[in-house]
Amino acid sequence: MAVTKLVLVRHGESQWNKENRFTGWYDVDLSEKGVSEAKAAGKLLKEEGFSFDFAYTSVLKRAIHTLWNVLDELDQAWLPVEKSWKLNERHYGALQGLNKAETAEKYGDEQVKQWRRGFAVTPPELTKDDERYPGHDPRYAKLSEKELPLTESLALTIDRVIPYWNDTILPRMKSGERVIIAAHGNSLRALVKYLDNMSEDEILELNIPTGVPLVYEFDENFKPIKHYYLGNADEIAAKAAAVANQGKAK
């Protein structure tokens, strides 16, 4: 049976991950630790014999720079890359820039958990005159006003990620190309929910660690057979738990 592999990598720790702030579409860069995580992911992929024909990432530099570091370790810096806003992190609306623990102290752990992980729950909206509104950013100049979010739930994130998967990424895989995607916690959760047919309750509890390669294997009909992280299982579990705890009051 022919098996096709897909590699997903959430960006390494960003400066705002480190500061425990809601990031969303804000274009913050990797922390030193995040760069190290990205390089380690690349080394791990090389050790496991992976190489690629094409890469996808978002238009946010924490994902782009993660991909650069991964490809550098693989000696595949030449690889063609498509960047799309459809792989961006979920837009966190008016929460962007706020400290997660302080927000939990103000609104309660459960409210923040729902804002972070609830399937159809949207954080408070931005206004269009807010400097954080993506309509002010030249990288989104070609998007219609309807496409520019004021806030997003995971459900709304799925609405942009899955058509991009089906229309753009999957056909390339079906043509025989080996693909890697470097993206974000929630754009990857959107894809994982779809691939694994997870319920809304199941996705609520899913936390994807930074900078750890997640491998999906597909059968000849491009149905997922299995998935697994590369690396030390205990370390990966600890990183996922740390992601879950970011939204709790101290």
UniProtKB/Swiss-Prot annotation:
It comes from the Bacteria. Keywords: Gluconeogenesis, Glycolysis, Isomerase. Its EC number is 5.4.2.11. GO terms for biological process: gluconeogenesis; glycolytic process. Disulfide bonds: none annotated. Gene3D superfamilies: Phosphoglycerate mutase-like. Substrate binds at residues 10-17, 23-24, 62, 89-92, 100, 116-117, 185-186. Pathway: Carbohydrate degradation; glycolysis; pyruvate from D-glyceraldehyde 3-phosphate: step 3/5. SMART domains: PGAM. The record marks 184 as: Transition state stabilizer. GO terms for molecular function: phosphoglycerate mutase activity. SUPFAM superfamilies: Phosphoglycerate mutase-like. The active site is at 11 (tele-phosphohistidine intermediate), 89 (proton donor/acceptor). Catalyzes the interconversion of 2-phosphoglycerate and 3-phosphoglycerate. Belongs to the phosphoglycerate mutase family. BPG-dependent PGAM subfamily. HAMAP family: PGAM_GpmA (MF_01039). NCBIfam families: pgm_1, PRK14115.1. Homodimer. This is 2,3-bisphosphoglycerate-dependent phosphoglycerate mutase. It comes from Salmonella typhi.
